[in-house]
Amino acid sequence: MSNSQSEGKRQPAIVILDFGSQYSELIARRVRETEVYSLVMSYCTSADELRQLAPKGIILSGGPSSVYAERAPLCDPNIWDLGIPVLGVCYGMQLMVQQLGGRVEAAIGKAEYGKAPLQVEDPRDLLTNVESGSTMWMSHGDVVRDLPEGFVRLAHTANTPDAAVADHNRQFYGVQFHPEVVHSSHGIALIRNFVYHICGCEPNWTTTAFIEEAIAQVQAQVGQKRVLLALSGGVDSSTLAFLLKKAIGDQLTCMFIDQGFMRKGEPEFLMDFFDQKFHINVEYINARQRFISKLKGIIDPEEKRKIIGTEFIRVFEEESNRLGPFDYLAQGTLYPDVIESSGTNIDPKTGERVAVKIKSHHNVGGLPKDLQFKLVEPLRRLFKDEVRKVGRALGLPEEIVRRHPFPGPGLAIRILDEVNDEKLNCLRDADLIVREEIREAGLYHEIWQAFAVLLPVRSVGVMGDKRTYAWPIVLRCVSSEDGMTADWSRLPHELLERISNRIVNEVRGVNRVVLDITSKPPGTIEWE
């Protein structure tokens, strides 16, 4: 999302220039938490483009490069003449120093990673209410050796003399740590200082404001034409259904494609919920065998995602011809979906991505090139927590608002092998046990996602004095705020024991349960 058209008509108060950091969008989320709208754009964005956007502040993100490297990503040097306050974070600070006449070098023997106490020397402006000795998250192998003219030191750590710097006259600020991550204890205070006290922003990015703008944007985009919604029953598509119903009424047709990869009992729950409780008409399409046959012999996860995405569109196209005509396809694509599917930062000199592509999202990377619909994606500028707020404001019940995220390709990407009915039934039963036990323990709403994964191997076991040779199930439970980063959930041992015992005793074809204790990064939440 690097252009104002895809973001609607609202102009960003804060622009984040992305230099390839996996935390760039987290910066945007932290700014939005202050009720100020922010937009992530490529580091290639020109000073002229920024002048037209007229943001009140600019944040330069971190990144994996060194500013002195031959192909280091650089921002337009004319940005420094715009008269707009700038905050550089990690690489962004080093770039600011380098371009304004300072010097950055490799931190030989003194690279700093992880938590470090910040010693505040100047508590004005940026560091107001940031306590000296507070913990900040460091992640850098380079350090500033010489500050540019006009800059002063604001704070230091044990290994970083210039951990925070400023040119107060020009309102240029830099920090060598990451205030956006949860590990930085006073990071939010620092961001608020920059957004409110330095940039003078107003708190007008609210749920009510978004709903009003989104409705107006959809009405302007769609006009009197009809929209087909790909409804899955999760919080994203359900919120989208409520939003579109409010915006365009009977111009909306919801369609649920049962591709055979849903969790146990979900198709029935979905149809009852929308039809009986909220009287939103949903067309049910049973396409289970069609999807499973398309995945025959397919193991590669990227190929699975693209096949499922393509087949979804094909089914929608066929059904739209029967029910239509429809001009638009609505999707519950969110900001993290777009982020994980493509790096927006392409070096114009080398053609190389600065940010590494993680995996294609089924709503983004899986779309066929000959798509017959125009897309309506009013949620694509929101993070998951923002979607939940919108859903609540629109009247969506908590049982939907607080449901755990579920991938569009469903259980097909939780079977790390060829997909067939036997494996699907096995995984459905195991997954149901996981969710039942976590709900019974009162932990469901404390966990971001909890699910089972079926591995493509078999292990030896003994049951009833007989040798077994069956599949292992992986238990994956993570805690997160927005899905951008995640930590594995520390479940009570007694709960883990109950889950394991039930799965090996109740699920046919399984004789072993293992626990995934990998955080994101380095892993992703889903296995495929």
From Swiss-Prot:
Ligase keyword on record: yes
Domain (Glutamine amidotransferase type-1): residue spans on this chain: 13-204
Active site residues per record: 90 (nucleophile), 178, 180
Regions annotated as coiled coil: none
One Gene Ontology cellular component annotation held by this UniProt entry: cytosol
Record keywords, A-Z: ATP-binding, Glutamine amidotransferase, GMP biosynthesis, Ligase, Nucleotide-binding, Purine biosynthesis
Catalyzed reactions: XMP + L-glutamine + ATP + H2O = GMP + L-glutamate + AMP + diphosphate + 2 H(+)
Subunit structure: Homodimer.
Protein name listed in UniProt: GMP synthase [glutamine-hydrolyzing]
